Amino acid sequence: MNTSMHTPGANATPSRPRPVLMIPVRRCGSHALRLRLNFNPQFFSPYPLHIVDFMPLVPLYGDLADDNAYFRMVVDVIGLQAASMVKWPDIAFDPVDVFDAIRDEPRSVHRIVWEMLLRAGSRHKAAVVMDKSLDSVHYADELMRLFPDMRFLNVVRDPRAQVASMNKAIIHEFDTLLNTQIWIDAHRRACDLLARHPERVLTIRYEDFLADEEQTLMKVCTFFGIEFLPQMLDVTRSVEANQIAKLSALWVSNCFSPIVANADKFKKQLSMDEIETIETLTQEYMRLYGYEMMTDARAAMDDKAFRIARSRSDIGKELAWRDLKERNFRDYTLRCYRADYLARVRAGLEATQGMSGQFNCSAVA
């Protein structure tokens, strides 16, 4: 990523909230935790921006030391937030204000995202702001350079249950092998981060949260330095939980207490061959996190298996989008709008960026 080093300013401001990133991969029960923690006014975690989807566009901006390029990135990232399925409450961002606030700091798309998060958190008088963009674990090193006080909440879930959930989610692949690989890549990053910075990372298991919500939430609150509140245990009172449950089937269960028996639901959702595939690839992490295996974990996989998996997933994704369009027009339209926004940003960058790398708006005037 292209960054231009400047003297840091806002990082050193003690009145700003502490930044926290939840890691490492979606469908781990992350919304359940976020929605409960949000009952504490000291804590603020809006619907995630998932900047990972913006990252392929970053090279198109060229040298971020160029004010023109960096300001345009600020405008586009703020636009991405506006195009998100769930809007952040009670705040609107002025690109000029955001740009002026961070122009003399290390330049990065992540600095823009976190300026927005920290401003939103400050507006809500929060002491801690958490980004639930779990995929940003892949950018943890840069985030720590930008924010030396950043902490990480590492949420682990049984890979068999998590992959079974990922297989049904339009945000992931529609194949067990491919989703298992995503799971491994994310947890490899998380484990590396934990090994190098153990004091910055708290690891919790989703299954432990299912078994004892109160103890798990108390542990997280202690790590964040905020107070545990009993109302965190009644998510049915969460306005946001009820709001997002109506938007997407992915979130419909978030306005209810989790069902402990669902931890083993993967046994009915996956074939034994799929379970063995997952266990073969993730056995190192399953042992590390204390999950018992059901197979000998000796599944054979080669390049052909991955090619078949890719083809199967592509077909499944196409069918899933068709089904979503028929089943839930709100979810479909909102997701398409965000995807269209990213496509428009890419098209605009490609159209206005001349051979010199400078932006030429007259090209599309």
Over which residues does each language-model region extend?
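PAPS-dependent sulfotransferases, especially Golgi type II membrane carbohydrate sulfotransferases
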Residues: 2-21, 226-365
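Short, conserved clusters of charged catalytic residues that mark active-site
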Residues: 17, 28, 112, 135-138, ...
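P-loop (Walker A) phosphate-binding loop of NTP-binding proteins
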Residues: 25
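Active-site micro-motifs of SAM-dependent methyltransferase domains
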Residues: 39, 45, 51, 161, ...
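PAPS-dependent sulfation machinery
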Residues: 44-131, 136
